[in-house]
Each structure stands twice: as C-alpha cells, then as structure tokens.
C-alpha cells in the first residue's frame, strides 16, 4: 500500500508540472519540440527544458484488455534499460479530460529522455483513478515477468 501511495504522489507532482505547461499556453497543442519555444526563467526549468541524454524507446504493453479497463497502455523508457542491469524510476501520467497519452507523447518522450520509465494510457476520463490503479498493477506484473523488458527494472523505493 505504501508503494502505491508513493507512486500516486509522483503522479500528482507530475500532473501539477504538466498543468503548468497547459496554463502557460493553453491555446496551442503540444508539439514535438515544445521545449525549444518554452521560455523558462528558473534555473531548474532551464536545466531540464531540453531533452536528456537517453535515447527513448516506446512499447505498447497492453492493448484494450478487459482486466485493465479496455484501455491501451504505453510505456516510454530509456533504451539503455534493455541492456543495463539497474533500476529506473517510474512515472505514471494521467491524462486530462478528453486527452490521451497519444496526444501528449512529446512530454512522455521528454521525461523518458531524462531516465524515467513513463507510463500512459488512452483513458480520456482519469478522474476516478481506475486506469491508474490498473496501470500500476500491469507494471508490477511486468516487473515480475522474466520475459518482460521491465523485469526487475522498476525502482519502487
């Protein structure tokens, strides 16, 4: 239960971070290179505005399975995860009303380029949190599956 609370806290922090982007320029869609035109004043924002050092890979881990709410779940992650024997931090992003992970893909890729495993789904109404819970269950299952690229790769601490 503590692990889920911690993961939900991370979700909330990332949601607030993403909200700052939408409030800054709500009239425009997120483009592939949104970080180039974003004018940041803070040192932290300037440091992380550009892409990170990791090449990003993307994988669909569940496609409309009933046990996971009939949503598609996708994961963006540092490609080095496939070959390095280490654990990586995971971020689960919940979409806003009528949005999906497909529409916000540049943000998912951006976070993955900084070394995060980033999970998203196609649930357009995440307010009740069911798809978040199902997504966490799915990632726990993949982290325990020897055949999965995510086997023992998710940092749960």
Which residues fall in each region the model found?
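Bacterial N-terminal signal peptides that target proteins for export
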Residues: 2-11
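Short amphipathic alpha-helix adjacent to the substrate-entry channel of hydrolases
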Residues: 102-120
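Bacterial N-terminal signal peptides
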Residues: 11-20
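Solvent-exposed loop/turn segments at secondary-structure junctions
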Residues: 81, 96-100, 118, 123-128
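N-terminal cap/lid segment of alpha/beta-hydrolase-fold proteins
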Residues: 28-86
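Short beta-strand element of the alpha/beta-hydrolase
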Residues: 86-96
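Sec/Tat signal peptide C-region and signal peptidase I cleavage site
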Residues: 23-26
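Gly/Ser-rich "nucleophile elbow"/oxyanion-hole loop immediately N-terminal to the catalytic nucleophile
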Residues: 82-86, 130-157
